[in-house]
């Protein structure tokens, strides 16, 4: 026994790779019923998850968790069993695929670095009821840039909860895991178990985790050997049919008059040339969103707001075109009639090539303080991206995008970028772009404003600009620091991107201390400061801003954070303002599976940006989100956002209003749900409800039937009853994945 204990503790001081060679079985040996049967998994290797990575620092795991791995010609089989006491609460509910609420559950995780160069990790996870979440983890140090949930793999998962354990079984086709060509594979991998206990989130792993190394994907280093596999090339057809009917009533007492039914059919094709290169083609795609975007308050924004991409075609593979700059924004391609996308990643390179004919082209013009958005006509778009993987510590790339407008005008952008990991603590990111533009001669934007000597109105002018982004980062277990420099010229524009401000030379310095202490009432704490200084290209001071912030994690999985943002000086629309402080308090908590919430409150001084003459005002905003998991099937959540800005000397408002959104979802299974969304917006005096039935058995096959019912709360000074809908739409779509593997 003493010898075993000594060996165990010695393992914590050795971060050496462990190597596993899997045993091969027949595909029909394992019955994927969610119960890990010892006889079925007898040939699998067993890997214990012995490290508690958080909150403990690579200490012995309290909960006994074992993973099982084996494979057949075409599939990788993975199982997890986590042993518990009979009175242990296991968090698990039936969730739709890739729904963020799943991270309130206890989760099993496997990560693959199939190219063994830390370019990314392919992550598969599920809870003990088989609900799935897969993603691509990137080589970044902040959570915003680290996770790409657009990665989707078609795999099978089933799980169950017993008196003394919870468990899950997965069957993953090799064709769904991006990897090098060849029948013999060697990958890096590791395993995880994330669960809740006594008001804390606990993370276990099969490897020790180095908190001094901020590169999480670099720490997936255990070796997995698999031989003589068969990876069939995918040839997939994705036909769809959809229909909708819309109507509107002219007056309150009229019946809704419906237009003729609109019908659409289209086809998608996905084919593999080999294991590393694929082509997608879509004809007459239906990219209507199944779920409405959460409405954001924009009444005091001088620039356009950016929304997350929800269309699977445009989100797949786009991690390679993520830039600090906003050089690529897939939602700038709004209504394509045809599009193609080539994806390729080899042992030392990656390629992304997208083309599209867009029928409705948004046209975004950035300036020093404001942005201008117009709706254009047809355009031809292509985007090309190449990245060279030098090794696990260096990569360089180039990027180009082109947009040619029907009737004249274009926007071309070229650039280079790179990542250099100088050592475990230091890294450098850089992006350099140059644009060449000729405006269309169109009436898409109605404005008499000027940007230097150039009019905002589209009158065929030619211009070009450039942008530079540099970031130095230093990260250790306790200290995180970065310096960012942004140099964006007055005529910089990205026609297939999203840049809303230019004419700035902007430096940011950030320094943070953090510590995981794992005490009864204090799990961790963090505090930091940030300085921003911004000049124009004419060397005029735009902004001096100083922030201070702290964050603690305490009982009940609760995080409390506070930020004091002091704009010492700000110039907006040529007017100088001084002393604009704001405070921001946030509380986020997940005390139980039944209930979690997020509260934020911001107060202080801000500008009324959209007044004819900008002025200071007293700001007050708050947001409350609450989610109730009634049982493993039913979830109800609500979100209330309120914002107001008052004049300093009087009680009059520049603006005041709120948006309330209520979502009810009943999840019959992992694939079938019924959802009802209702939203009331007092800013634009509207109310809508959106009922929807959705069946989604894999990432591509989908059926939904739903509607949109809209009410204008105030028209011609007449108040319409809340459920007296002015506009109505009913729609359905059926899209089915037909796999014709070669």
Description of each model-found segment:
Residues 2-12:
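Sec-dependent N-terminal signal peptides
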Residues 16-387, 397, 408:
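Structural preference for beta-rich elements and adjacent junctions enriched in aromatics
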Residues 23, 70, 111, 125-127, ...:
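Residues in well-ordered beta-strands of folded domains
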Residues 27, 73, 105, 274-276, ...:
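A generic structural motif
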Residues 40-42, 85-89, 132, 143, ...:
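A short local loop/turn or secondary-structure capping micro-motif enriched for an aromatic residue
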Residues 110, 148, 154-155, 242-243, ...:
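Short leucine-rich amphipathic alpha-helices used at interfaces
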Residues 170, 188, 258-259, 278, ...:
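Catalytic-domain carbohydrate-binding cleft regions of carbohydrate-active enzymes
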Residues 335-337, 343, 411, 419-422, ...:
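Exposed, low-structure sequence patches enriched in small/polar residues
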